[in-house]
UniProtKB/Swiss-Prot annotation:
The gene for this protein contains a UGA in-frame termination codon after Leu-25; a naturally occurring frameshift enables complete translation of RF-2. This provides a mechanism for the protein to regulate its own production. It is found in: Cytoplasm. Signal peptide: none annotated. Belongs to the prokaryotic/mitochondrial release factor family. GO terms for biological process: viral translational frameshifting. Peptide chain release factor 2 directs the termination of translation in response to the peptide chain termination codons UGA and UAA. One of its GO terms (cellular component) is cytoplasm. The modification N5-methylglutamine is found at Q253. Keywords: Cytoplasm, Methylation, Protein biosynthesis. It comes from the Bacteria. Methylated by PrmC. Methylation increases the termination efficiency of RF2. This is Peptide chain release factor 2. One of its GO terms (molecular function) is translation release factor activity, codon specific.
Amino acid sequence: MFEINPVKNRIQDLSDRTAVLRGYLFDYDAKKERLEEVNAELEQPDVWNEPERAQALGKERSTLEEIVTTIDQLEQGLEDVSGLLELAVEADDEETFNETIAELEVLDGKLGQLEFRRMFSGEYDRANCYLDLQAGSGGTEAQDWASMLLRMYLRWAESRGFKTEIIEESDGDVAGLKSATVKIIGEYAFGWLRTETGVHRLVRKSPFDSGGRRHTSFSSAFVYPEVDDDIDIEINPADLRIDVYRASGAGGQHVNKTESAVRITHIPTNIVTQCQNDRSQHKNKDQAMKQLKAKLYEFEMQKKNADKQVLEDNKSDIGWGSQIRSYVLDDSRIKDLRTGVETRNTQAVLDGDLDKFIEASLKAGL
């Protein structure tokens, strides 16, 4: 006799995941309708009078076909594999049962590829990225929290095999960091981290309070992709304020001897970038300009997507100020406020175990 319940449960799991993709994540019905429209356009004899449009339609058809066909195959495959399981049980046939499990592996692989495609479908998801951390209200406690977040993300990046480079660190008044920027290098770095943008709330008994009272503090994270040099982003030099200063934080014995650190402020948006990781002021300025270009690009993308997000009834606030996760250390509870994912293993999360939170937000299409 076979263990059929685990197999039935797996079929149900694959069916549920397929239904989620078919529904609001990929909107299968709308894509199938659009595919019919695109096919009809491409069948018109005069379509190649506009070669660029024809090529764009061909590319769109390829994308739509892959999604529609894969979902069709998954639904048919799950129906077939359910029948195969029934046949195996009725005939008490181990070979057919093993064939059922093998077919499930194939379907799981197809579904996983489609889920991955949905999670990382953005234009810059494959890119390297920058992560800005900024201590919020809460003084020393918030600055210590910013340094804890930096450590958490560095550990996470290391566990994922990404390389990291500290671009800027501004030390806190007593402990921790006022701000930091880290570059995360590796395929899909931005895709993995983009939903981490927002405010992170810490609740704990402060080690900086002699009375041991409970404090609430905030630090913000902002993730933006490294953009190609050929991306056309107009920056008027008159809109920039460039300050040079002596670097603080890590950097060795020579770090404070020259004003090599550079801070660039884009006055119309009040976006600030800074770099201090090189002894050359010129190199630091180049890096800060690259970050500014990337940050302005992401800023514009967020503005363009704001109306779309409202129309899709996404309840998350647009922008950099929305609170995304609460870390209540005294109660041993970390909860994502967008997806409801929660854990009591707070130390593991602070040591970089973020995948369950990140994957849930990506699969939810945030």
